[in-house]
């Protein structure tokens, strides 16, 4: 049974119809990778899921009945906060607070949003930094960390508030090639632990290896979606075949920290 469902998501920017009636749902523990060319609407769609962008139309609902938002109506502050507490975003550019240590960045949501005790939040934050392989970097500031390390801090921060769903917007696109693997390995670990994730990515082999389902978006539409294996081996839509041909997917690629 699906955990989150959205229907008929419509979004315009300055007269440009960016999302043209997107229907989507995701099950608890499922990992969905969204692929697509630049300008396809994939990042905009992801940002709509926690109101970083506001669609003009569409419905978002958690299927347990706890939250339903009609984007054509005024959204209450209570519903907005409820949605953001149930989802966490991992950004392309990390978006860490520059004057706070890695530990303080991870603690932020627990202390400020969830009002947890600082000592308890510190203990949890250290545990999460250990999970992503950065406990020994806890006291360093973002400027003292590599891009891959900053992104892993961002992932730890996203996990800290125990979200129902993690939204990741091209988490490796700003990284030097040699740093990509450490982030992908971390995401692979989270997938194995059963976290629910939607990942906008251009890492084709990673999507094939880790995602339960892969979606191709183009021109504001979902063109095709299927299990990862069938998406890459038996694409049904001509647009998907062209996209995969242009991507020149490598046959084998392993990721290491």
From Swiss-Prot:
Question: Where this protein primarily resides, as one coarse class?
Answer: membrane
Highest taxon, organism lineage: Bacteria
Q: List the disulfide bonds.
A: none
Q: Name one Pfam family in it.
A: ABC_tran
Q: Which residues form the ABC transporter domain?
A: 4-244
Can you list the GO cellular component terms from the UniProt entry? plasma membrane
Question: What residues does ATP bind to?
Answer: 36-43
Instruction: Quote the subcellular location field of this record.
Output: Cell inner membrane
Q: Name one GO molecular function term.
A: ABC-type amino acid transporter activity
The membrane topology term of the UniProt record is:
Peripheral membrane protein
What are the UniProt keywords, alphabetically? Amino-acid transport, ATP-binding, Cell inner membrane, Cell membrane, Membrane, Nucleotide-binding, Transport
InterPro entries reported in the protein's UniProt record: AAA+_ATPase, ABC_ATPase_HisP-typ, ABC_transporter-like_ATP-bd, ABC_transporter-like_CS, MetN_ABC_transporter-like, P-loop_NTPase
Q: Which PANTHER family match?
A: AMINO ACID IMPORT ATP-BINDING PROTEIN, HISTIDINE TRANSPORT ATP-BINDING PROTEIN HISP
Function per UniProt: Probably part of a binding-protein-dependent transport system for an amino acid. Probably responsible for energy coupling to the transport system.
Q: Which protein family is it in?
A: Belongs to the ABC transporter superfamily.
Output this protein's name: Probable amino-acid ABC transporter ATP-binding protein HI_1078
Q: Kindly list the organism's lineage.
A: Bacteria, Pseudomonadati, Pseudomonadota, Gammaproteobacteria, Pasteurellales
